[in-house]
Each structure stands twice: as C-alpha cells, then as structure tokens.
Curated annotation (Swiss-Prot):
High-level lineage: Eukaryota, Viridiplantae, Streptophyta, Embryophyta, Tracheophyta
Keyword Metal-binding: yes
GO MF term set: cinnamyl-alcohol dehydrogenase activity; zinc ion binding
UniProt-recorded name of the protein: Probable cinnamyl alcohol dehydrogenase 9
GO BP annotations, alphabetical order: lignin biosynthetic process
Pathway: Aromatic compound metabolism; phenylpropanoid biosynthesis
Residue ranges that the Swiss-Prot or TrEMBL entry lists as coiled coil: none
Record's catalysed reaction(s): (E)-cinnamyl alcohol + NADP(+) = (E)-cinnamaldehyde + NADPH + H(+)
Length: 360
C-alpha cells in the first residue's frame, strides 16, 4: 500500500493544499525528506502567490497531481545544511524559485539553463529527485538541493522581494537573452499585472524608454507616476495605436488571455522583437505578413536558470527593484485566489507564512 503524504517521509510538515480541481485550499498535513548531504532545509517566511498557482490548483492545464501544495516564490531562513553544502550556512536568508531539480548532465544544464532540462523538477506538483512528490511553499518549511537555493541579497526585502523569484526572472531572462537591454531603446510592455509591472521597473533600470500597452486606460496614471513608465498606450484607441506604429524596438507580451498579435506586431520597428511570456488557454493567430515584411521576430521564454536567477536578484537589489505587493495571511488565500482570477490585485499577493501559518 502506498504511503500517505503524512507518512511518506520522517519529518511532519503543515501547510495548505488543494485536494481537487475545485481549487479550494485548506489545512494539509504532509511530510518532507530528511535533510540530505547536499540539501538545505528552509524555514519559510514569505511565499508569493503566482498565477501558475491558481492554474495548478484548478487543473486548468490538465496536469495537476493532487493533493497540491502550491508556492514557488519562497523566501526563508536556512535552518539545516548538509555536510556537502558549501554555498550556505544555517541562518542565511535564502530563496527558492520555480525549479528544484534537474539532471545536471544534459546540454541545457551544462549551459546553466536548468529550466529547460528535460528532467527538470518543479518546486511543486512534480516528482522530485528522490522519486517522491514535491510540495511547495504554502507550508512551514522545504528541503531543497543546494544547487537550487538562491542567496537573497541583504538589502532586498523578504516580502516584496519574494515575487522576483518567478515574476522577476520571467521578465529578466528574455530581456537578457534577446538583447533587450540597450539604453535608449524603446520597450513596450503589454499587460500590466504581476509580470508587467516588474518588467517596467527592470526596463527602466536598463535605461530603456518604456511604454505600457493596455486595453484599460484606468492604469495610465499608475503606470507613469508610480511605476515609472514613460508613456501609456491604450489599445482600444485607434488614433493612438496608429500613431504608435513602427515606434518600438521590443515588446514583452505578458498577457495571459487570448488576444490579437497583429496590433502588437504593427507597433514594432523593422527588426523588432515580440517576446511572449503569457500562456493563453487557446492558441493565438500569428500573421506572417508583418513578420516577413518587417523582418520581425516572435519568441518566447520560460523563467531562467539558477545562475541567471541569482544575477537577477543581485540586479534588483542594486537598483532597488521589488514587486508591489499585498501581504495576506495564510487563511486568506482562498479569497486571494478569487481576486487573482479577476485580476483584482496590485500587483502580487504574498503570504506572511511565518506569522500566520499555524496547525488547526
């Protein structure tokens, strides 16, 4: 007989998990492995709430493996380190992001692109290197191989810094890879949510001119006066869209809803790049004419490897970049998920795990 989540490993842990596609989260007792020779045990202080968490607890993508304990934007304190651990010591403040394992021997891993490893393990809703299920950061603690633990910079706040472990690297990695970092160039950010608002801040830190592209004019003042964008373009205004044709060098498309790509491609200059980060539930139509006639590129990107994620954290610390957050208690998570589904958050929920998670 298979062991239950609570008896599978020797160390009892408490968290909140979803049992089925209703997505309702409730108190959940499970267990974690002993701290191994290469492991770091992390007492979780804060955990960001990512849109992926919402998709996963509701099985929107069809691969949820219940019960699910979500959470991959984790900041905490190292409480145990294995004898082979050289990067961390007890008491260090650390982060754990989207991935917690990879094969370490494939071409992607050799290039510090563990996030593209065919055997990559997600921090939750996946099978770990020991053959048992991974549970995420909506919990007391987590045990992770040191290679997938990040040093959290001293001047980066634990709460508002937590979302950088997913949202931050998701926008930083494509900007670096696709060469979207040349000061003075014009970056469009399509969608002003959890990813988009961080993209604005990182773009400005690279010295880019940043325009937020949105269907909602109500976000204009906040985008410019609060987040620091240079301009705001409303996609429902035909005159302004026409005037903006051919003005942008790059566009980061963070929109997760089904939307038209043709208008965005029209905003790009010759040789412009449109990089998609959102994951709409249905395929998008990709028109060929603007690509061919303007020698334009459409690409994608998925988080980043460990080396680049550490680089991103250090960059954000240097430039005082954090996420705009709403701090919540653990027992407020279901309400937060309902609001997240309606895009009713500015711009990321973060759970105060250490001060609000307690067994019933």
């Amino acid at each position: 007989m298979a062991k239950s989540p609570e008896t599978e490993h020797p160390n009892k842990v408490f968290g909140w998990g979803a049992r089925d596609k209703s997505g309702v989260l409730s108190p959940f007792h499970f267990s974690r492995r002993d701290n191994g020779e290469n492991d770091v045990t992390v007492k979780i202080l804060f955990c960001g709430v990512c849109h992926t968490d919402l998709h996963t607890i509701k099985n929107d993508w069809g691969y949820s493996y219940y019960p699910v304990v979500p959470g991959h934007e984790i900041v905490g304190i190292a409480t145990k380190v294995g004898k082979n651990v050289t990067k961390f010591k007890e008491g260090d403040r650390v982060g754990v992001g989207v991935i917690s394992g990879s094969c370490q021997s494939c071409e992607s891993c050799d290039q510090d692109l563990e996030n593209y490893c065919p055997q990559m393990s997600f921090t939750y809703n996946a099978i770990g290197s020991d053959g048992t299920k991974n549970y995420g950061g909506y919990s007391e603690n987590i045990v992770v191989d040191q290679r997938f633990v990040l040093r959290f910079p001293e001047n980066l706040p634990s709460d508002s810094g937590a979302p950088l472990l997913c949202a931050g690297i998701t926008v930083y990695s494509p900007m670096k890879y696709y060469g979207m970092t040349e000061a003075g160039k014009h970056l469009g950010v399509a969608g002003l949510g959890g990813l988009g608002h961080v993209a604005v801040k990182i773009g400005k830190a690279f010295g880019l001119k940043v325009t937020v592209i949105s269907s909602s004019s109500t976000k204009a003042e906040e985008a410019i006066n609060h987040l620091g964008a240079d301009s705001f373009l409303v996609t429902t205004d035909p005159q302004k869209m026409k005037a903006a044709i051919g003005t942008m060098d790059y566009i980061i498309d963070t929109i997760s809803a089904v939307h038209a790509l043709y208008p965005l491609l029209g905003l790009l200059k010759v040789n412009g790049k449109l990089i998609a980060l959102g994951l709409p539930e249905k395929p998008l139509e990709l028109p060929m004419f603007p690509l061919v006639l303007g020698r334009k590129m459409v690409g994608g990107s998925d988080v980043g490897g460990m080396k680049e994620t550490q680089e991103m954290l250090d960059f954000c610390a240097k430039h005082n970049i954090t996420a705009d957050i709403e701090l919540i208690k653990m027992d407020e998570i279901n309400t937060a998920m309902e609001r997240l589904a309606k895009s009713d958050v500015r711009y990321r929920f973060v759970i105060d795990v250490a001060n609000s998670l307690s067994p019933p």
